[in-house]
From Swiss-Prot:
Family listed: Belongs to the RNase HII family.
NCBIfam families assigned: PRK00015.1-1, PRK00015.1-3
Protein name stated in the entry: Ribonuclease HII
Domain of life of the native organism: Bacteria
Reaction it catalyzes: Endonucleolytic cleavage to 5'-phosphomonoester
Name of encoding gene: rnhB
GO biological process: DNA replication, removal of RNA primer; mismatch repair
Length: 256
């Protein structure tokens, strides 16, 4: 077998052990190098699977009781502009997207790739959005909670219990609050991905409305280019006027 053919063969996730045994006898350096690379990839995949299954430890306790579990997370607490977005996701027990993890650990491209897969494989997905005006009226913490409530109530299937990332959702459901829950629960991690991609899409839309603020790059966070635009043009209608330094600029001309 030619080395290029062996290279293509070793791209598979699972290979007949008999074939691997035969390749191990091949003394060509190129073949042995490919085998080493394959083994490393397999070890990495095994570790990824182990960690993925470990992030279902909370869900498994409830699944064993026949309960549906909803993971809840939010994104957008810290930005100076735009809404806070929450998502609630109910995953099936056979969910197997190994790359699902805390959205902050994933590249934008990976989040975008996982987003439609989560929507397709989840039992139910709900999204909640609280805009900057609500945030200014009731504060970011309470707006967070309302967005989470809206997300849970938007689920087409009612969960029996919620796993929430360090918050309490104002709904009549049993809840388990997990510190850094998006790194401990796949349900919360899936919700974090949905919320992040959904909010980023909204901020891309706002970037077209207010091109001077580069919302498609900074997502409303206080980056250097964002702060420079604020000083030059003043706040837009989507800025959080109670957030510093926007609050100090309220007297400036607002962008139309």
């Amino acid at each position: 077998m030619k080395i290029n053919e062996i290279k293509d063969l070793l791209q598979a996730d699972s290979i007949d052990p008999a074939i691997l045994a035969e390749l191990a006898k091949d003394d060509r350096k190129g073949v042995q190098k490919l085998l080493v690379s394959y083994q490393r990839r397999q070890e990495k995949l095994a570790k990824q699977k182990e960690e993925f299954l470990g992030r279902f430890s909370y869900e498994k306790d409830f699944w064993a009781k026949g309960q549906l579990v909803g993971g809840v997370d939010e994104v957008g607490r810290g930005p100076l502009a735009g809404p806070v977005v929450a998502a609630a996701v109910i995953l099936p027990e056979d969910f197997s997207l190994l790359e699902v993890n805390d959205s902050k650990k994933l590249s934008p491209q990976k989040r975008l790739a996982l987003y439609p897969k989560i929507l397709q494989e989840a039992v139910a997905v709900g999204v909640g959005v609280m805009d900057n005006k609500v945030i200014d009226q009731i504060n970011i913490y309470e707006a967070d909670r309302l967005a989470m409530k809206q997300a849970v109530e938007a689920l087409s299937t009612r969960p029996d219990v919620l796993l929430v990332d360090a918050m309490n959702v104002p709904v009549d459901l049993p809840q388990l609050e997990l510190i850094k829950g998006d790194a401990k629960s796949n349900s919360i991690a899936a919700a974090s991905i949905v919320a992040k991609v959904f909010r980023d899409s909204l901020m891309d839309d706002y970037a077209r409305l207010y091109p001077d603020y580069a919302f498609d790059h900074n997502a409303g966070y206080g980056t250097k280019d964002h702060l420079e635009a604020l000083r030059k043009y003043g706040p837009t209608p989507i800025h959080r006027l109670t957030f510093s330094p926007v609050s100090e600029m309220v007297g400036l001309k607002k962008a139309d």
